[in-house]
């Protein structure tokens, strides 16, 4: 959340936040302090961006999902995360309906990490299929999700397993061609998958490239 917000704000874009009930969201504390022994958390610069974000009026006073009007926004950005509190966001039917509307209006739609689950669960009632059925995309890969789990399960249990199924597996089940889920090759090199107006990324390592790609797409639509 913090990196795209910071880079978009620098470019003069107004970033509006939204939550289920219009209450402010909070970063998982472990991402600030470090998941284990002060490690595996967010990078120092990203933490600084989050501290700035905590002073942003629109972040502190988000609109409800039901109040989102896709017609007045240029893009929808679906962030990631893995803590148990994410389920409220990942399973929200209103947000899924709004996501379908963004697609129908041919707006820019972007997701990173677990945000891809929202896309996978957003069903277009006109087709009965997910909005990304015919798309090429990425999301948190099984490789990365497994590494995070195996490194931390001895202390944190299933902290890194939001659901029994891996993100990659759930997303692939909704795609017309399972090969359309792109892992991006080198998992530790920034990667973003772009398919027309869909921009997707895998994990925090991709956040800067993800934000820069969103900006590039928005700038292109101006001309």
What name fits each language-model region?
Residues 109:
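Conserved, well-structured core segments that form or line functional sites
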Residues 113-115:
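Catalytic nucleophile serine of serine hydrolases
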Residues 1-105, 118-223:
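Extended, subdomain-level signal for the structured scaffold at the beginning of enzyme domains
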């Amino acid at each position: 959340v913090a990196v795209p917000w910071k880079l978009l704000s620098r470019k003069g874009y107004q970033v509006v936040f939204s939550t289920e009930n219009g209450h402010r969201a909070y970063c998982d504390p472990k991402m600030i302090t470090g998941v284990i022994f002060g490690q595996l958390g967010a990078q120092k610069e990203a933490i600084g961006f989050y501290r700035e974000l905590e002073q942003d009026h629109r972040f502190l006073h988000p609109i409800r999902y039901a109040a989102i009007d896709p017609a007045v926004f240029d893009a929808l950005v679906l962030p990631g995360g893995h803590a148990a509190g994410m389920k409220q966001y990942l399973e929200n039917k209103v947000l899924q309906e709004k996501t379908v509307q963004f697609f129908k209006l041919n707006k820019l739609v972007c997701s990173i990490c677990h945000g891809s689950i929202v896309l996978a669960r957003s069903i277009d009632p006109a087709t009965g299929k997910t909005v990304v059925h015919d798309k090429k995309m990425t999301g948190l890969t099984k490789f990365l999700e497994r590494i995070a789990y195996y490194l931390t399960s001895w202390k944190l249990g299933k902290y890194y397993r939001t659901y029994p199924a891996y993100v990659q597996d759930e997303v692939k089940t909704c795609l017309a061609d399972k090969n359309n889920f792109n892992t991006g090759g080198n998992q530790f090199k920034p990667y973003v998958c772009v398919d027309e107006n869909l921009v997707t990324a895998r994990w925090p390592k991709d956040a800067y490239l993800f934000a820069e790609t969103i900006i590039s797409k928005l700038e292109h639509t101006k001309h």
